[in-house]
Design a protein with these regions (language model features):
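Beta-strand-rich modules
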Residues: 422-444
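Extracellular fibronectin type III
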Residues: 438-465
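Conserved aromatic anchor
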Residues: 379-391
Length: 469
């Protein structure tokens, strides 16, 4: 589908508008006005005409189910606390990483930090990572400074066309967001996220994956998520198929805090962001069941935000992961030092990230939504979809819309898939229906966009109940 105006005009508009925006970052309480960009056309699945002569399989049973993959488990065990400690200490050693700090020194300021991150991606990338700076302008509170994201891309090798973005902002700040001279330690916020990002890149670069993975270190988050906005808007304009954006910000933990993480996803029950959050929670529970993911049905903490909001704004599925409890006394303070972080906690967050990213990147393609039709029997539905020849089976989800978690899945082998009837559902309940593909190692793809059936299906399918892309 063509756009009513040229892509060049849209890009020019975005760059001009970017210079006019400048509000506080993740640590302040004034929300940032979001840039209004052209709304993407509604996703239209490829034309699929069901085979009326195909055999219908009713209430199938399958032994092809999600399982712990030994190769992914081995990668998880490679996560090194020593590496994480070294990365956080290195980030703190730059003195400050404020967006307005020195860019020429080799040892102090944001310029030294970004060059070190760039070189570290090259060092750990096993010759597979394509590393580049993504430069952009930033104006904030009457000041301007050129900025750079550091982007490391691990191209997909299995024919997949999805892009998984794993991100963490590398800048920090003292109390004054424009103070580029004063010391700003920024160990947990967000040296911990950068450490996770680099350690994940080190481990995942040792393998090839079906989908493309982008490791994104963003700048100027503290002044208003400028770097994430620039990346997300350009990915949107370039028609990138971002299937997941995972934001890690302040994930280091401290001694004595509850052993879980919080996951923020806006409009969790009905949005694509919520679907990504459910997938994340499910895979995390499979691989690290003793380190729970607690779902937060919100874009972020009240009055706060992070880089993922820029991906939400352009319609890419995006979530934020953050430690279980924050210490407000450490926020934008020089007390936020490397020695207060719980590296066992940070290691477990990194392991969850590896499990989720490896399943998304190593599993089959995300299926297109099935056609769902009610049958004569109340509570019975027929699902029809094209079967991926690479898939070994499928998971089918009939999720009551008032439930934020997945129900018990129904499973079907590929040879029985494509025309499946499920019975025994409650005809008085509105369900969100989706499917995911499984490979022969038990890796689960992302779930298809949910289709709604039941008494209130029309309201949900029309999008009238949602306020986000």
């Amino acid at each position: 589908m063509g756009w009513p105006v040229s892509r060049a005009i849209i890009r020019t508009f975005l760059l001009l508008a970017l210079g006019l925006l400048g509000l506080a970052g993740c640590s302040l309480l004034e929300p940032q006005p979001q840039l209004v960009i052209p709304t993407p056309p509604a996703a239209t699945p490829a034309l699929f005409i069901p085979d009326a002569s195909g055999q219908i399989v009713t209430d199938p049973v399958s032994d092809v189910v999600p399982t712990i993959d030994p190769l992914i488990e081995a990668l998880i065990q490679e996560t090194s606390q020593q590496q994480l400690i070294a990365y956080v200490r290195q980030m703190e050693s730059f003195g400050t990483r404020n967006a307005f700090s020195d860019t020429q020194s080799e040892t102090f300021g944001i310029g030294a930090a970004r060059r070190w991150i760039f070189n570290e991606f090259l060092r750990v990338g096993n010759g597979r990572l394509q590393v580049e700076f993504q430069d952009f302008p930033m104006s904030y509170s009457g000041y301007s400074a050129d900025q750079s994201n550091v982007v490391a891309t691990l191209p997909g090798a299995g024919g997949g066309n999805g892009v998984i973005v794993i991100m963490a902002h590398y800048d920090d700040r003292p109390a004054d967001a424009t103070d580029g001279a004063s010391r700003a330690t920024g160990a947990n916020d967000n040296g911990s996220g950068v450490a996770l990002l680099l350690e994940t890149a080190r481990i995942m670069s040792s393998r090839q994956w079906n989908q493309t993975i982008v490791f994104l270190a963003t700048s100027a988050e503290e002044q208003g998520s400028f770097g994430a906005r620039y990346f997300a808007e350009n990915a949107f304009l370039d028609s990138e198929n971002v299937i997941a954006a995972l934001n890690y910000d302040a994930v280091g933990g401290r001694a004595g805090i509850p052993q879980h993480v919080r996951l923020f996803a806006v409009e969790y029950a009905i949005s694509r962001h919520g679907a990504l959050g459910r997938y994340y929670e499910y895979i995390a529970g499979l691989y690290l069941p003793t380190f729970p993911v607690l779902i937060q049905d919100a874009l972020d903490r009240e009055g706060r935000w992070g880089d993922h909001r820029e991906f939400v704004a352009v319609g890419f599925p995006a979530i934020r992961v953050i430690e279980s409890v924050e210490d407000p006394e450490l926020l934008n303070s020089n007390r936020d030092t490397w020695d207060l972080i719980d590296y066992n906690y940070l290691q477990r967050v990194a392991q969850i990230n590896l499990a989720v990213a490896a399943n998304l990147a190593g599993g089959p393609q995300q299926p297109q939504p099935p056609l769902v039709a009610g049958m004569a029997e109340p509570g019975a539905f027929l699902l029809t979809w094209p079967v991926d020849p690479v898939a070994a089976g499928y998971a089918i989800s009939f999720r009551p819309v008032d439930s934020i978690y997945y129900p018990t899945f129904k499973f079907v082998k590929s040879e029985n898939a494509g025309n499946v009837a499920l019975t025994g559902l409650d005809p008085n309940v509105t369900y969100a229906v989706s499917i995911a593909a499984l490979n022969d190692r038990g890796l689960l793809s992302g779930f298809s966009i949910e289709q709604f059936v039941g008494p209130d299906a029309a309201s949900y399918n029309s999008g009238a109940l949602s306020s986000v892309p």
